[in-house]
């Protein structure tokens, strides 16, 4: 009994430290996910610099309290819960989880936390549709290049007209 209590306290401490070091996290219900799906998701998240943890609900509640994420509504933490933790980039983590949630109809977002805000499942689905940082850089560069490209085409047309 004592070992079990120490083990649970250690789990809370470890998970709380992980949450505190992260850029954000997404809590989702993994009811419809098979072991193969979980392994694939874990690999995708690892490649993005993120982690997935399946924890007991009470351990998650206590870890959220000890790491000062008190805005999360505890009533939504029920059932089979997994947490995707974004160590480097939370948006990429959210996109990976969203792609799996779309494939598996039984899975659903519960809530998430990043940028010092709590997001519900609807907000997370909307945010997941936004382009990533690299995509935005590409869009921005194409906007910058367009006038220059058109100017060069105009110069080429003038040159060909002579």
Swiss-Prot record:
Pfam families: Ribosomal_L10. Transmembrane segments: none annotated. SUPFAM superfamilies: Ribosomal protein L10-like (SSF160369). GO terms for molecular function: large ribosomal subunit rRNA binding; structural constituent of ribosome. GO terms for cellular component: cytosolic large ribosomal subunit. Disulfide bonds: none annotated. Keywords: Ribonucleoprotein, Ribosomal protein, RNA-binding, rRNA-binding. GO terms for biological process: translation. HAMAP family: Ribosomal_uL10 (MF_00362). Belongs to the universal ribosomal protein uL10 family. Part of the ribosomal stalk of the 50S ribosomal subunit. The N-terminus interacts with L11 and the large rRNA to form the base of the stalk. The C-terminus forms an elongated spine to which L12 dimers bind in a sequential fashion forming a multimeric L10(L12)X complex. NCBIfam families: PRK00099.1-1. This is Large ribosomal subunit protein uL10. The gene is rplJ.
């Amino acid at each position: 009994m004592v070992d079990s209590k120490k083990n649970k306290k250690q789990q809370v401490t470890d998970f709380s430290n992980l949450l505190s070091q992260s850029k954000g996290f997404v809590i989702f219900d993994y009811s419809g996910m098979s072991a193969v799906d979980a392994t694939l998701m874990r690999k995708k998240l690892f490649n993005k610099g993120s982690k997935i943890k399946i924890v007991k609900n009470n351990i998650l509640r206590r870890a959220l309290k000890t790491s000062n994420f008190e805005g999360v509504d505890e009533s939504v933490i029920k059932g089979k819960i997994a947490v995707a933790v974004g160590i480097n980039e939370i948006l990429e983590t959210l996109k990976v989880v969203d792609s799996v949630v779309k494939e598996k109809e039984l899975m659903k977002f519960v809530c998430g936390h990043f940028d010092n805000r709590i997001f519900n499942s609807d907000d997370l689905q909307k945010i997941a549709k936004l382009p990533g940082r690299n995509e935005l850089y590409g869009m921005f560069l194409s906007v910058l290049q367009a006038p220059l490209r058109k100017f060069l085409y105009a110069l080429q047309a003038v040159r060909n007209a002579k």
